[in-house]
Amino acid sequence: MLAALLIIIATGCTVTTKDPAYVPPAPLQPMEQLEKAPLADAKTFSSGDDVLSFITADRTVACSLTSARGEHLNLPYEQNRYSDASNNKLPIVPVAYCELATYPALQPDDTKGDCAGTHLGYLGGVALLTPDNARYGECRSGVTPMEAAFGPKGSKTGPLAQLPVLADGQNLERNGLRCSAYNDGVACGNVSAGVGFFVSPKRYELIQGPAKTSHPPQSEGQKTP
């Protein structure tokens, strides 16, 4: 022991120990994270046609900063009707869209009726941001593409598996909307309007801006199998 101590002194080395009383700072609130986190180089995440797409390092959330015509999203990794001629009359709106491999159940207030009589279920696992609104859930039958790829029975293959990883703490921005990978999930928002969402496998939060009611963060509860 003495010999080891003498070697440390002679070489000028220092030994650090963890402070048992240290408490790491709490994560920033979603909108603060989006405002303050550094922006990543958008070129790395461009999939053409003015779309930025990424997946988180743990492969739990995949998102795109893209455009929508009505309910039709321009997603390069999924079949869609965004470019159909019949939709050209619809206005183009910038959006952020995220899918989860496993996800929290919907809060009752976020369930949107009977899906206009289509007999589809209104299910969680996706979040959509427009410049003035954020929502969680959608009308669909079956699993999300992320659930099919990276859920409990996922194939771990396909277009989503090829998306570039947005490192934890980084931000992406397109047409006034931002997304950031942080706190074991992803936050997306329109910082100037105070509208956004946070999604993770354990919980979600919708932030509707100062003129609307924001949902409190969801406690960790029921998830999809």
Predicted regions and their residues:
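A low-complexity, Ser/Thr/Gly/Pro-enriched, surface-exposed linker/loop concept
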Residues: 20-44, 70, 75-163, 195, ...
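Bacterial signal peptide processing site
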Residues: 14-17
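An exposure/low-complexity boundary signal
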Residues: 152-186
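Extracellular/lumenal glycan-associated surfaces
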Residues: 57-70, 173-193, 218-225
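C-terminal motif of bacterial Sec signal peptides marking the signal peptidase cleavage site
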Residues: 9-12
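N-terminal export and membrane-targeting signals
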Residues: 1-5
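Residue-level signal for mature regions of secreted extracellular proteins and peptides
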Residues: 6, 56, 91, 108, ...
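Extracellular glycan-recognition/adhesion modules and their associated mucin-like linkers
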Residues: 46-60, 108-109, 168-174
